[in-house]
Amino acid sequence: MQGAASHDAAAAAAAAAVLGGGHGVPRWPRMVFLVGAMTCLAISATAHLLACHSRRASVVFWQLDYAGISAMIVASFVPPVYYAFLCHRPARVAYLSAISALGALVVGALLSPPCSSPRFRRLRAALFLAMGLSGVVPALHALWLNWGHAACYLALSLEVAMGLAYAAGAWFYVSRVPEKWRPGVFDVVGHSHQIFHVLVLVGAVTHYVAVDVLLNWRETVAAACSATS
């Protein structure tokens, strides 16, 4: 009995430390994702508008576009990792540090002129997919730590749906379907790049819903570490 009481007291203290004295579950991780996603989409819109200005502008704006995509992927990791590992600081710090380092490496690689050329579109898609798939490790770890919580199962299902949307978008981006089947027919509406962007938006919205599920779950259990220990 005494051991259980000590464990609960330690759990409560850990939760209070994470919450900064019990002022509610932090919202800033969700804001990180929102800012990252909106920044990425704003850069992408600017690149599509101005990249045709000159050859130099094309190179610069598409490099910024690739950096924005990498930043959005990194930002997407922040809320689910933060909320899933709210009471497991070492794991939280390790996973967020790892994806940040991976994002920096990918940006560094894609800012090199050869990798930003059109002929390396498959490599770029592969790098972005690799960044996303690296989330499988923290997802499985979080599932193990929070086994038995229906909200975690729902959030994971939504994240899988998000991954499928992004993967499908990457496939359209690389394959250039359907315009390669009917050249000229989809020049204005319905070409692969438009489908790619629609699927990115679908994935981002799905991810936001998953984050909201995790945040509400943390609120309902008062972010108590004992609820996930």
UniProtKB/Swiss-Prot annotation:
<feature type="transmembrane region" description="Helical">
    <location>
        <begin position="93"/>
        <end position="113"/>
    </location>
</feature>
<feature type="transmembrane region" description="Helical">
    <location>
        <begin position="31"/>
        <end position="51"/>
    </location>
</feature>
<keyword id="KW-0346">Stress response</keyword>
<keyword id="KW-1133">Transmembrane helix</keyword>
<feature type="transmembrane region" description="Helical">
    <location>
        <begin position="154"/>
        <end position="174"/>
    </location>
</feature>
<feature type="topological domain" description="Cytoplasmic">
    <location>
        <begin position="1"/>
        <end position="4"/>
    </location>
</feature>
<protein>
    <recommendedName>
        <fullName>Heptahelical transmembrane protein ADIPOR2</fullName>
    </recommendedName>
</protein>
<feature type="topological domain" description="Cytoplasmic">
    <location>
        <begin position="175"/>
        <end position="194"/>
    </location>
</feature>
<feature type="topological domain" description="Extracellular">
    <location>
        <begin position="26"/>
        <end position="30"/>
    </location>
</feature>
<dbReference type="GO" id="GO:0009725">
    <property type="term" value="P:response to hormone"/>
</dbReference>
<keyword id="KW-0812">Transmembrane</keyword>
<feature type="transmembrane region" description="Helical">
    <location>
        <begin position="125"/>
        <end position="145"/>
    </location>
</feature>
<dbReference type="Pfam" id="PF03006">
    <property type="entry name" value="HlyIII"/>
</dbReference>
<feature type="transmembrane region" description="Helical">
    <location>
        <begin position="195"/>
        <end position="215"/>
    </location>
</feature>
<dbReference type="GO" id="GO:0016020">
    <property type="term" value="C:membrane"/>
</dbReference>
<feature type="transmembrane region" description="Helical">
    <location>
        <begin position="5"/>
        <end position="25"/>
    </location>
</feature>
<keyword id="KW-0472">Membrane</keyword>
<dbReference type="InterPro" id="IPR004254">
    <property type="entry name" value="AdipoR/HlyIII-related"/>
</dbReference>
<feature type="topological domain" description="Extracellular">
    <location>
        <begin position="216"/>
        <end position="229"/>
    </location>
</feature>
<feature type="topological domain" description="Cytoplasmic">
    <location>
        <begin position="52"/>
        <end position="66"/>
    </location>
</feature>
<feature type="topological domain" description="Cytoplasmic">
    <location>
        <begin position="114"/>
        <end position="124"/>
    </location>
</feature>
<feature type="transmembrane region" description="Helical">
    <location>
        <begin position="67"/>
        <end position="87"/>
    </location>
</feature>
<dbReference type="GO" id="GO:0009744">
    <property type="term" value="P:response to sucrose"/>
</dbReference>
<feature type="topological domain" description="Extracellular">
    <location>
        <begin position="88"/>
        <end position="92"/>
    </location>
</feature>
<feature type="topological domain" description="Extracellular">
    <location>
        <begin position="146"/>
        <end position="153"/>
    </location>
</feature>
<comment type="function">
    <text>May play a role in abiotic stress response.</text>
</comment>
<comment type="similarity">
    <text>Belongs to the ADIPOR family.</text>
</comment>
<dbReference type="GO" id="GO:0038023">
    <property type="term" value="F:signaling receptor activity"/>
</dbReference>
